[in-house]
Each structure stands twice: as C-alpha cells, then as structure tokens.
Amino acid sequence: NSGGGLGDSIQLFSLILSLQNHFKTTEFFYLGAHENHFEGKLKEYNINIKTLNLGLKYFGFRWWHILFAKKRFLNKDSDKIDLVIDLQSKLRNTIILNKIPHDHFYSATFGFKFCTKKKEYLSNDHLENLSSFLNINIRKIKFNLRNLHEKYKSEAKRLLPDKNYIGFSLTQGNIYRKKNWSIDNFITLANKISEKNKRPVFFIEKKEIEL
C-alpha cells in the first residue's frame, strides 16, 4: 500500500524489484489511493505489479473506508493476504488498511506498533526492516537503466546531454493535491543553484499550459 503519488511510486522501484526477485512465485498487488502508475505513466519501466482495486476512491484517506475495506476485499472472492506491507505513515490510513484480512502486517506507523511481529526495527529502509520481519536476507535489487527502451534513453541524452542537472517537479505527483510552493519560490531556488554551477531543470507536463 502506498499513497499513490507519482513520486511515491518511483521510490518503490527497488523495494518491489527486490521482493519480486526473492519471492519469485509470489503474486504481488498494489493498493494505492489513486491509480496504479506502474500500469500507466510508469509502464515503460516494465515493473509489473497488479492492482488491488477495492472501489474506494482515495483509499485510506476517508475514515468511512474503515466500514468497507474488509467487505470489499472479501467480495473479490479472496480469503486473505499473506503479508500486507503498509508504506504509509498516517494512523488513519494504517488502521483502515489493517482491516483487510491478512496473516501478517508490516507498518512503520506509530513506531511499528501495528506489525504482527514485534521486533526492533532500527532502519529507515523498509527492505532492511522486512528482512528482519521475515527472518530472511532479501538482496537489494536496483532498477537497471538498461531495461529501458533505447528510444527513452536517447531522448534523455538529447534533452540533458551534460551533467550537474538538478530537477524540479513543478506539479504535484498526486493529482488531487496542489504544490505548496509557488512558482516564484522554485525560480528563486533555481537561481541560487545556478550560482553553484548546477543546472536547474523543470519537469512540466505538456498539458500544464499555464506553467
């Protein structure tokens, strides 16, 4: 389970690949507050993970979901999940997610109090904590750029041929929220970065005409 923003999904690359590499015969599902970006904007990265769609918009962000999470899951002719991995940090989201039938539950929320296995989780790295949780050593797998289609790498080299770039995302990866920062703040910071011989780059979707 993840918040569902584009940035949230990108940060999951290594975790998903590592778990899929270790548990090769296991079926993985993604449950987020919004669309599964691995089947949409990030599909070119070829990270395959199925969507668990409970039909609850903004899943975990509405208290009334607590009344329907279990029922919607059972209506999918599913019994329970072997392991639920909660990557949120809000108490509300975790409580709602915990309603889905499961054998084991991993969550960093509230000092890991919701974990079904009580241990000392000392790392900020979920993969390290999951290795401890499962009593196994899960090898970390990073995304390999060689897995990207050559046309995307060629386009990246065309747009960014040099080095020392620092990227700014001017829009919110979560389409239901707005950036707290104004465009003026981004420009001010970009100017300061330029003074340090870095090259600011602004990531803007074509549809963002005003920007």
Task: Provide a role label for each language-model segment.
Residues 1-211:
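Catalytic machinery of carbohydrate-active enzymes
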